[in-house]
């Protein structure tokens, strides 16, 4: 994990990309996860390894004036052993919406589960899912599925 990136910027910075490239070049690194931007950032494959540039917010309550800070992603990755080495066997993301304090206690809403159950604002949940999915996949990552 690396605390890196520009706050509130959805695109990874040059420094994030350079760090991910250096780290994934090592045989000792199986995946890179960056955090700091407070917004969802893309997922990518770098040197054949998964890089998660940013998951957004899950606990912080950012000002509503900061775009996209009420969206997040829960990442689920599974590793197996292949030829005696760790190998990524599954990567999934769960789009989430972080509720506002004006709605009562701050809650994390799993977007697809709430859409399936009919709870919450459909328009807001659909927009969150659309935006999160577009951002996660914006660098063309393959082998990652939405849950």
Predicted regions located by residue number:
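Conserved beta-sheet core of the metallophosphoesterase superfamily
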Residues: 12-75
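Active-site beta-loop-alpha junctions enriched in small/polar residues
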Residues: 3-4, 38, 56-58, 94-96
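Short acidic, glycine-rich surface-loop motifs adjacent to enzyme active sites
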Residues: 1-9
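A short C-terminal boundary segment appended to hydrolase-like catalytic domains
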Residues: 67-147
